[in-house]
Structure formats: C-alpha cells, structure tokens
From Swiss-Prot:
<keyword id="KW-0687">Ribonucleoprotein</keyword>
<dbReference type="GO" id="GO:0070181">
    <property type="term" value="F:small ribosomal subunit rRNA binding"/>
</dbReference>
<dbReference type="GO" id="GO:0022627">
    <property type="term" value="C:cytosolic small ribosomal subunit"/>
</dbReference>
<dbReference type="GO" id="GO:0003735">
    <property type="term" value="F:structural constituent of ribosome"/>
</dbReference>
<dbReference type="InterPro" id="IPR001648">
    <property type="entry name" value="Ribosomal_bS18"/>
</dbReference>
<keyword id="KW-0699">rRNA-binding</keyword>
<comment type="similarity">
    <text>Belongs to the bacterial ribosomal protein bS18 family.</text>
</comment>
<dbReference type="InterPro" id="IPR036870">
    <property type="entry name" value="Ribosomal_bS18_sf"/>
</dbReference>
<protein>
    <recommendedName>
        <fullName>Small ribosomal subunit protein bS18</fullName>
    </recommendedName>
</protein>
<dbReference type="GO" id="GO:0006412">
    <property type="term" value="P:translation"/>
</dbReference>
<comment type="function">
    <text>Binds as a heterodimer with protein bS6 to the central domain of the 16S rRNA, where it helps stabilize the platform of the 30S subunit.</text>
</comment>
<keyword id="KW-0694">RNA-binding</keyword>
<dbReference type="Pfam" id="PF01084">
    <property type="entry name" value="Ribosomal_S18"/>
</dbReference>
<keyword id="KW-0689">Ribosomal protein</keyword>
<comment type="subunit">
    <text>Part of the 30S ribosomal subunit. Forms a tight heterodimer with protein bS6.</text>
</comment>
Length: 94
C-alpha cells in the first residue's frame, strides 16, 4: 500500500520575482582583462573598488575576481590597512 504523498520543501517556498532573474550581468575578472600580474598595495584607487561601504572586502563571487587575484587582493588590502592607507571600518572616510 502506498503511504500519503509527501511534499518537498521546494513546493512550500515562496517564488522569487522574475525581475531578479532577467538581468544578470556576466562577471569577469578585471585583473585578467587588464593583464595585471600582481596587485600592489600602493594602488589605493583599485583597492577601494573592492571594499564595501561598511569597510568589508567584497567576496569574489560578487566581483567575479579569479581566486589567485582574490588572494592577492586580500593581502594587498590588509597591508594597506596596516600602513593606514585604507581604513579598517566604515567609521573613517576613504
């Protein structure tokens, strides 16, 4: 005998609006395109683009940066923070 039908949790989840699914920009690694071999901690303008408003480093899944450059980027940002070129938090202006 067959038991009662069971539903997956997928069926009970609310549906996402179609608007979010329509516009997806293809992410690309900025450093690969420009041919950068190594990220320098003294290039503050580039590093600022990868820091969120609250002071956190933006993850690679959002920026599209390749893993090798994301590691270099993290190291460069941390060095620039240590040398007071970049702020640690959002309490200070960049």
């Amino acid at each position: 005998m067959a038991g009662p039908k069971r539903f997956n949790n997928k069926d009970k989840r609310p549906k996402r609006p179609a608007q979010n699914l329509l516009f997806k920009r293809k992410r690309f690694c900025r450093f690969t395109v420009t041919g950068v071999e190594e990220i320098d901690y003294k290039d503050i303008d580039t590093l600022r683009d990868f820091i969120a408003e609250n002071g956190k480093i933006i993850p690679a899944r959002l920026t599209g940066t390749r893993a090798i450059f994301q590691r270099q980027l993290n190291t460069a940002i941390k060095r620039a923070r240590f040398l007071a070129m970049l702020p640690y938090s959002d309490q200070h202006k960049i």
